[in-house]
Amino acid sequence: MDSMNVPEVLEIKRIVEESESVKTFIFSWDFRREVRPGQFVMVWDFRDEKPMSVSLIDPVRSEIGISIRRVGEFTDRVHGLSEGDLLGIRGPYGRGFELMGRDILLVGGGIGMAPLAALADEATARGMRVDALVAARTADELLFLDRLEAAGVNISTCTDDGSCGFKGFAHERLLTLEENHDMAAVCGPEPMMFQVMRILDERDVPAQLSLERYMKCAVGICGQCCLDDTGFRVCAEGPVFWSQELSRVREFGRYRRDPAGRRVPW
């Protein structure tokens, strides 16, 4: 069996509290298994297993980080762990982001900034100019601002309640930005991404968007994360898709499926 498909039990090296509800768990990593921004891993707490984005990729320190938002029983248990505790990590899986051109735009909402933070690190290390539109419901939920600033990223913020930056939604703030970009990478709530993609398509900016779906196997076998009507598997052909691909996906921005396969509107 491919060792990538067997969980490797790793010790939590460090824990960073990003916000009241988000923690980043940092592990030592053998980079013979390459990790790309936008890929995900399956995190196993010895009771259950869930897909999580990789938010930190540091080959110099041989470390990766996984940022986890506290939203339910599984994440409650993980948030209760301490440095030195163990988690199982399986992967990485899926298609990540591709960098192209010299000027790139990142648009992230909430925990959607996790894979974009890793992408920003790589882009700035390559000497690219990076603009980031960071959105959240309130100022306390804006993520990775210090890290992005330290990397030399040009940051714009927006919050639903106006507590930091522009008051409104990410797509509304995007309409006020006139910068030309060679590409865009987007991750966050799907209704937000749907609106952002429409604006980027109108501006002829090539866009890559990272989707989230309910997953079980992570290796393209179970079909749980297939998208209507294309059959794209989010765990295999995704989670990162080009906007041209998502324009063929009937459910994008409209509905998703629950663990039983029933449609759930956004």
Swiss-Prot record:
Keywords: 2Fe-2S, Electron transport, FAD, Flavoprotein, Iron, Iron-sulfur, Metal-binding, Pyrimidine biosynthesis, Transport. [2Fe-2S] cluster binds at C217, C222, C225, C235. Its cofactor is [2Fe-2S] cluster; FAD. GO terms for molecular function: 2 iron, 2 sulfur cluster binding; electron transfer activity; flavin adenine dinucleotide binding; metal ion binding; oxidoreductase activity. It comes from the Archaea. Transmembrane segments: none annotated. It holds the Pfam family DHODB_Fe-S_bind. Residues 5-99 form the FAD-binding FR-type domain. Pathway: Pyrimidine metabolism; UMP biosynthesis via de novo pathway; orotate from (S)-dihydroorotate (NAD(+) route): step 1/1. Binds 1 [2Fe-2S] cluster per subunit. Binds 1 FAD per subunit. InterPro entries: Cyt_c3_hydrogenase_gsu, Dihydroorotate_DH_ele_sf, Dihydroorotate_DH_Fe-S-bd, Dihydroorotate_DHASE_ETsu, FAD-bd_FR_type, FNR_nucleotide-bd, OxRdtase_FAD/NAD-bd, PyrK_electron_transfer. One of its GO terms (biological process) is 'de novo' UMP biosynthetic process. Responsible for channeling the electrons from the oxidation of dihydroorotate from the FMN redox center in the PyrD type B subunit to the ultimate electron acceptor NAD(+). Belongs to the PyrK family. Heterotetramer of 2 PyrK and 2 PyrD type B subunits. This is Probable dihydroorotate dehydrogenase B (NAD(+)), electron transfer subunit. It comes from Methanothermobacter thermautotrophicus (strain ATCC 29096 / DSM 1053 / JCM 10044 / NBRC 100330 / Delta H). The gene is pyrK.
